[in-house]
């Protein structure tokens, strides 16, 4: 009982189980508990923009070398492109081999498209050009108010670069932002005490509204997706961590609290603040974490990438739409663009899938109606895979930059270093002599 009182992940796990039971036994009550999950996610999202700002600004300003900032960003984008391409390809291969939609013989004309109208209409506004232009905020206040991670990240990089260029004159501002970061993460600690409540409400709503019967009706597709996501984590991400000299299973145990929070809320964004702090404590470079993790929430959605190719071919198979190998490669090419616009929030993958089907053309968009009921049950695996992928990305880019404290990382994963201890590569910044840059 004492362990339950101290352990967040056990509390969240218990809340998820209880939420599923309430949703199954009392569907109407479960469906009415949605505000608990939504409220928790809103509390976390309230903190994401200022945390990204504070972390990125202090990281870049202390780094001093602006060429290094560009190098880290480019390495991060290259890593994201390779891993998400592999994830898309794996989803495509599994869909071809397992054929989860074969034999359903669905006539697209008989499907009710009213329920998916909001997704298809929203997808029209998520084109590649719109996405790229949206990285530039209309104004800074608007970016922070809406919590747009990429817009906040762009402003934060510019702000941090300006602080580094100001050198000594920027020291008071840097110290203020550094202190702000400590306050924000303390607030995160307060908010995370409500994680079990949010997980309970979100799970009760999911099971209460959609029911176990919906889950069983498309069991083959769900099983394929969960198995493929697990395979990607174990093989691909495990291989990356092995290159970094770390154990995948110890890494997963280290981030178990974040995994269970995401499991309960179906949103990898709900664990972003905790994940950034965990990666710093693991021994990753703070500037790398500040750049890579926020960018990853738009460019490194491995779980969503697997889902997109798997779901696209599932709809084609279910509606008896013949897709040639050339067309599959075209789908892959389209998804290389549209998947980068998938938000790390619940439902983002579904909207991106609608955009992809619209762009491809030969697969009926009406087929989305087949997924509407079960999509929510697959969002947990999407979000967890996205979370793990972004954590591994920060480790990999830190290792690539030569700024991963491997000895500390192994000790932390082995449990021989208390998590409360600040990372060894983040000492208190010394006084900066005249004419020097703002190095940490």
UniProtKB/Swiss-Prot annotation:
GO molecular function: fumarate transmembrane transporter activity; malate:proton symporter activity; succinate transmembrane transporter activity
Pfam families: SDF
Annotated keywords: Cell inner membrane, Cell membrane, Membrane, Symport, Transmembrane, Transmembrane helix, Transport
Membrane-spanning parts: 8-28, 40-60, 74-94, 147-167, 187-207, 221-241, 288-308, 354-374
One of the GO BP terms on file: L-aspartate transmembrane transport
UniProt record similarity statement: Belongs to the dicarboxylate/amino acid:cation symporter (DAACS) (TC 2.A.23) family.
Name of this protein: C4-dicarboxylate transport protein
Species this protein is from: Anaeromyxobacter dehalogenans (strain 2CP-1 / ATCC BAA-258)
Gene: dctA
């Amino acid at each position: 009982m004492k362990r339950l009182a101290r352990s967040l992940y056990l509390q969240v796990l218990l809340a998820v189980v209880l939420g599923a039971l309430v949703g199954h036994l009392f569907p109407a009550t479960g469906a009415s508990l949605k505000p608990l999950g939504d409220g928790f996610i809103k509390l976390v999202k309230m903190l994401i923009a200022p945390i990204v700002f504070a972390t990125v600004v202090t990281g870049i300003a202390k780094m001093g070398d602006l060429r290094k900032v560009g190098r880290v960003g480019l390495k991060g984008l290259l890593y994201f492109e390779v891993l998400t391409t592999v994830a898309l390809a794996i989803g495509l291969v599994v869909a071809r081999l397992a054929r989860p939609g074969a034999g359903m013989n669905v006539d697209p004309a008989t499907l009710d498209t009213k329920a998916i109208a909001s997704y298809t209409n929203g997808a029209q506004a998520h084109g590649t050009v719109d996405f790229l232009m949206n990285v530039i905020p209309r104004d800074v206040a608007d970016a922070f108010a809406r919590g747009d991670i990429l817009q906040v990240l762009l402003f934060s990089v510019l702000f941090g670069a300006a602080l580094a260029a100001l050198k000594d004159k920027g020291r008071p501002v840097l110290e203020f932002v550094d202190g702000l970061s400590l306050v924000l993460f303390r607030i995160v600690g307060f908010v995370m005490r409500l994680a079990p409540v949010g997980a309970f409400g979100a799970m009760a709503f999911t099971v209460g509204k959609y029911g176990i019967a919906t889950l069983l009706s498309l069991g083959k597709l769900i099983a394929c997706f969960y198995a493929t996501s697990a395979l990607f984590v174990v093989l691909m991400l495990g291989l990356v961590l092995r290159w970094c000299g770390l154990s995948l299973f110890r890494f997963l145990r280290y981030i178990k609290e974040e995994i269970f929070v995401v499991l309960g809320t179906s949103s990898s964004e709900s664990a972003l603040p905790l994940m950034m702090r965990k990666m710093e404590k693991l021994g990753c470079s703070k500037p790398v974490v500040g750049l890579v993790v926020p960018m990853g929430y738009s460019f490194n959605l491995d779980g969503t990438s697997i889902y997109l190719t798997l779901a696209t071919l599932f709809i084609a198979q279910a509606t008896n739409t013949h897709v040639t190998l050339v067309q599959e490669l075209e789908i892959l090419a389209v998804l290389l663009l549209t998947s980068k616009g998938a938000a790390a929030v619940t439902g983002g993958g579904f909207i991106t899938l609608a955009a992809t089907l619209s762009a491809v053309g030969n697969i009926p968009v009406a087929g989305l109606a087949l997924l509407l009921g079960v999509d929510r049950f697959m969002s947990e695996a999407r979000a967890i895979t996205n979370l793990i992928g972004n954590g591994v990305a920060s480790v990999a880019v830190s290792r690539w930059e030569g700024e991963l404290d491997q000895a500390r990382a192994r000790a932390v994963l082995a449990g021989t270093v208390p998590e409360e201890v600040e990372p060894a590569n983040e000492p208190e910044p010394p006084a900066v002599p005249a004419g020097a840059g703002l190095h940490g």
